[in-house]
Amino acid sequence: MMKIYRTQDKQLTRVDDMSEGAWICLTSPTDEEVRRVAATLDIEPTDIVAATDPEESARISLEDGYTVIIVDIPIKVDGASEGVYTTIPLGILLTQELIVTVCSADTAVVGDFAACRVKGFSTRKKMRFVYQLLYRAATMYQQELRLIDRRRQAIEKNLAGELKDSDLMELHALESTLVYFATSLRANATVLDRLTRYKRLEQYPDDRELLDDVIVEIRQAIEMTLSLIHISEPTRHLRI
């Protein structure tokens, strides 16, 4: 699916043209949508679809005329119990004129911008949009980590009584989620570090405070994840 937005008179508006100041939002895009965006913006189709590959690693690369940024964002595993998540790539492509986001699924990280739930958001402020996406992703990790911790505590209360195989399986799934999160958050932190040092990407002084906030939130999410992994260690022998 492809939707195109542009901030006009401080309002987010759906538009049809891929012109300056627009945000092209691709969710599980069709081949035709990929070809159309690639041809219009002179972008390699492989760079557009990269983020739809669940195995794609977080990275940043400077291409001829555009920049590719890929980060990992959390998403709930379909059909799984509460607190069981995985991560999927979110692609962000920056050209001189506009920004493109690509993801294999609908997520709140992107959806909150389309629903106008993010203050100070403008499609015309590309780097600020990137930082806002990373900030939203970091805070979502923290939100999901709190859910994981609550679910872990609820399960471990049962360990003093009858131990069920389903409880052990769920604890293992929660632990796997924490490992996914730790790996993805570290990769995102590396991308952010590189992002701040690329001179090609225009940075504005007003965005510095937001950038600092993103760095703090990612670090906090990493610390929360590592702390929960450590807390889970005493019950790990029960799942072997």
Regions found by a protein language model. Name each.
Residues 1-206, 210-213, 217-224:
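Peripheral, non-transmembrane regulatory/ligand-interaction domains of membrane transport proteins
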Residues 230-240:
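Single conserved hydrophobic/aromatic residue that forms the stacking wall/gate
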Residues 225-229:
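C-terminal amphipathic alpha-helical segment
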